[in-house]
A protein has these predicted regions:
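Bacterial N-terminal signal peptides
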Residues: 9-19
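Secondary-structure boundary elements
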Residues: 19, 174-179, 255-262
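...with weaker cross-activation on analogous glycine-rich loops/strands in unrelated enzymes
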Residues: 184-271
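Low-complexity, Gly/Ser/Thr/Pro-rich intrinsically disordered linker/tail segments
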Residues: 272-330
């Protein structure tokens, strides 16, 4: 009987490992890459190819400048309905709106009274929700002019509104994650919170980026803004307050080369584009400490023009961030 039991246990383990959605066992024992992880990575790679975005090298330098969010030049391989970059970003928002109705209408446009005609006396900047504009525009306007204005306003909204979480939500939608598996939101912190709380049935587990090996399909996240969450401990301490006001960003891991000690990630709204980033790993296969702003304070030196003639100017590093959370795909 004991031998039979041991065989059954072994068989169960093999079946779990062979499952297309094989779960990561823990932060310390990530396990193999799942089919869902590979699917998410491929979706991100396909999206990058269509958008033709930026690329950042392992030193944090922008070495390829691609299309940006409000680009009006046709995408090389764009789908007929999304032939421009800005229309593609609008697609991300539309997809998010199907999971969180009202998201689109609440996006805001920034403007200032009199700014075009008399900038010297222009009023302070104001915000208007997209819903208000659409409701109040003239109903009897010429169809052509109405379309021109509507498209211009949508492009302005896209420029004014961070869309990186909408990009991640779009990928999750394409991969078929349910509302129980992923908290669709326009803010990364909202979908990070259930992972930190250990919500049952959630697709991701929250781990310390400094202690966990990333896998394809995982998300790596950092805090940003004036008072960012700088470490995993900060995220844990603030878990009950994580909402749309908490500024953060997440990339999805799309490739890993442990021999070369590097990984590739993809993120939306990174320098206003869908951006491919290369990051370095340490000898344990974890994110290199060279990328951790909590250990290496960000430089705040002269601007780029001054750097041309100032040898003391510190180079910008787009990879130096307050990386704290690794969202491990279960």
């Amino acid at each position: 009987m004991p031998k039979l039991l041991n065989k059954l246990i072994t068989l169960c383990g093999l079946l779990m490992a062979a499952s297309p959605f094989a779960a990561a066992q823990s932060c310390d024992q990530p396990g193999p890459v799942s089919e869902r992880g590979q699917q998410l990575a491929q979706l991100a790679l396909d999206e990058y190819a269509q958008f033709n975005g930026h690329r950042i090298d392992a030193q944090g330098r922008l070495w390829k400048f691609g299309n940006v969010e409000v680009e009006s030049e046709p995408l090389v391989d764009g789908q007929p309905g999304d032939r421009y970059a800005w229309r593609r970003v609008w697609r991300y928002w539309q997809t998010l709106d199907t999971h969180s109705p009202g998201t689109l209408e609440l996006r805001r446009i920034t403007w200032a009274p009199g700014l075009l005609d008399d900038p010297a006396t222009a009023g302070r900047s104001r915000f208007t929700e997209l819903r208000e504009f659409l409701d109040k525009r003239p109903k009897d306007a010429d169809a052509k002019m109405d379309e021109i204005v509507r498209e211009a306003v949508v492009r302005a909204m896209i420029s004014d509104t961070p869309w990186s979480a909408a990009f991640i939500s779009y990928l999750m939608d394409r991969a078929g994650l349910s509302a129980e598996e992923f908290r669709y939101s326009a803010a990364h912190a909202v979908y990070i919170r259930p992972a930190l709380e250990g919500q049952e049935g959630y697709a991701y587990r929250a781990c310390d980026v400094r202690r966990t090996q990333p896998r394809v399909g995982d998300l790596i996240c950092y805090g940003r803004a004036a008072k960012p969450l700088k470490s995993f401990a900060d995220w844990q301490a603030q878990v009950s307050e994580l909402d749309t006001r908490v500024k953060s960003h997440c990339d999805i891991v799309v490739k890993l080369d442990r021999k070369a000690a590097k990984m590739d990630t993809m993120g939306g709204n990174v320098e206003q584009s869908v951006t491919w980033r290369k990051l370095m790993l340490d000898d344990q296969g974890r994110l290199s400490t060279r990328h951790l702003a909590a250990l290496h304070p960000k430089p705040s030196g002269p601007n780029a023009a001054a750097c041309a003639s100032d040898p003391s100017c510190q180079k910008s590093d787009l990879n130096l961030q307050y990386w704290g959370v690794l969202m491990q795909l279960r």
